[in-house]
């Protein structure tokens, strides 16, 4: 593995999101001095917090899986996650609701899920689910250490017996077809393949290897931190500070000072911070601009679809909603065509509805509730641009409300006391390329050793972390990216065998 050469005693981490904080903790654990610079006044990055009218609203990811990766970050500085953060295991992990009126609670406990599938779709589908679960577990074991939790220096690193094992498992076939090999019910196929949407590839075209995301969601477990998702970066930042990190909030990095091929200082709008190495976690275009160079690629990068998010604080709730409810539209395949090809808004939307107060009522005033609705939309490269979204956003908000009232949440509009709307305008303003928080799509030419590297040619002591580089998009992979960035500076730490997520208290 290629590592940063020369002195690496003091490392500046740009960005106090999950990737930056994971990098900071692993660097501190290896004995480095660490300064973290964050433009916002609080840690979190994409996992931010909005407080309004007594509501505590998470502005970023709402799904937490693979908490063992969080545990690893705390363990790097000799701490236990449980001493900093309480995680609640959600049961069910999701509730899937379909256009035909049927619904399925998705359990991560194998026996409970098998029974639910049998009641939902019959004994044959339950047997298929059992086989699918075994396949997902094998897929995870083959991929995690060799293809996900690894720093690639060359595609030749793929030449390993695990590659043959992945091929034997059907990992290079198509995701939807492979899921269909186990369960033929169209609704079940959606439950185990919808995750590809956030990776930016339709299930019919995505590699079956991406079912590893379904493993994380439907086998390893879905969790929620007491206090909301923002409690996670807050706990990580506190642990980093207690371990000796200096955290500079409210400072925007304006440039990197260089001497030849080395970065010698990080310059903010308030101070000049000398460094031996730097970890950059902003979105790729921002990091490349700071470095003064963009790596050449044979083909332009393709980005994942974006999302419109509607945050609502309400005076009532809808008890049929689980903590996470996926409301599938009928036109599932057409949805992907609209999002990735024609650039149109979903004509029959599939939505993720999150009700965090179902698990932690303290996030809202007494008797009040929080609801978060994520509606995938085209990114600004293939769909409406920023200028169009300024006019389109309020109209689309009204369309979403009407659709939600027609489906799961009648009377929603009248129940809203606080709300916030996030569109590609906001993602663009935050520095996210193509107006999407989901960064570079996980097409085959943008995965593994072909994804933008965390080292940039021409700079010997700068390392990238975050969802745009390896291994990719999602909370677990972003945490891994921070660890991988740290290892580029410190060298590899003691390797661990892949583990399933630990248990936790159940919702």
Curated annotation (Swiss-Prot):
User: Which InterPro entries does this entry report, sorted A to Z?
Assistant: Amino_oxidase (IPR002937), Carotenoid/retinoid_OxRdtase (IPR014105), FAD/NAD-bd_sf (IPR036188), Phytoene_DH_bac_CS (IPR008150)
Enzyme nomenclature, EC number:
1.3.99.-
**Domain of life, per lineage:** Bacteria
Q: Could you state a single Gene Ontology molecular function term?
A: oxidoreductase activity, acting on the CH-CH group of donors
- Where FAD binds, per the record, is at 12-45
Q: What class of enzyme is it?
A: oxidoreductase
Name the needed cofactors. FAD
Question: Which UniProt key words apply to this protein?
Answer: Carotenoid biosynthesis, FAD, Flavoprotein, NAD, Oxidoreductase
A Pfam family annotated for this chain is Amino_oxidase
Gene3D superfamilies membership? FAD/NAD(P)-binding domain
Report the record's Gene Ontology biological process terms.
carotenoid biosynthetic process
Q: Which family does it belong to?
A: Belongs to the carotenoid/retinoid oxidoreductase family.
NCBIfam families assigned? crtI_fam
Q: What is this protein called?
A: Phytoene dehydrogenase
User: Which species?
Assistant: Streptomyces griseus
What taxonomic lineage is listed for the species of origin?
A: Bacteria, Bacillati, Actinomycetota, Actinomycetes, Kitasatosporales
